UniProtKB/Swiss-Prot annotation:
It is found in: Cell membrane. The lineage of its organism: Eukaryota, Viridiplantae, Streptophyta, Embryophyta, Tracheophyta. The gene is RAB1BV. It comes from Beta vulgaris. The keyword NADP does not apply. Its main location: membrane. This is Ras-related protein RAB1BV. SMART domains: ARF, RAB, RAN, RAS, RHO. GO terms for molecular function: GTP binding; GTPase activity. Belongs to the small GTPase superfamily. Rab family. It is a lipid-anchor. Keywords: Cell membrane, GTP-binding, Lipoprotein, Membrane, Nucleotide-binding, Prenylation.
Amino acid sequence: MAAPPARARADYDYLIKLLLIGDSGVGKSCLLLRFSDGSFTTSFITTIGIDFKIRTIELDGKRIKLQIWDTAGQERFRTITTAYYRGAMGILLVYDVTDESSFNNIRNWIRNIEQHASDNVNKILVGNKADMDESKRAVPTAKGQALADEYGIKFFETSAKTNLNVEEVFFSIARDIKQRLADSDTRQEAQPSITIKPADQSGNQAAAKSACCGS
């Protein structure tokens, strides 16, 4: 039987595709660069369409290869972004804690997920730029948590600049996806096998003869 598409070859146990979505300028590319390369820059060029990075991590003794796609937040690239939803196993919804409109638009991004992504896709809410001075904060932590609770998803505040919770957010969603895949494997293995026995030809012939005689 063919292996499920998320499974690995020799160098990893699981291949997990993640998608970063959210408005332009919320720091998706910075989060990706911090997690994949351990670096931060303020001179990012706005993502045009789609970009991705790969990082392999270890969880519970398993090697997890993360393929992380960074999407453009601009409206004109929305159709490109939605084309990548279907294959995503986990989606990080990112907003800027200093930009209330980016937070309010999270509901629109969730509607896009509901329209285009798989039903069982894992989601996580990320409030980025948490290192900014409190006087610049437009979205209180409690408000972000309340939205996450409303949708039944996890919530983290992060800073790509200071590396606050960046590892934690990616490891958290990867762990949840790995568990979902493992549970799916367990259910498949637990399904009883069905054996089809060959028909008793003599019995069938007798039945056919009896039916003939009775007609």
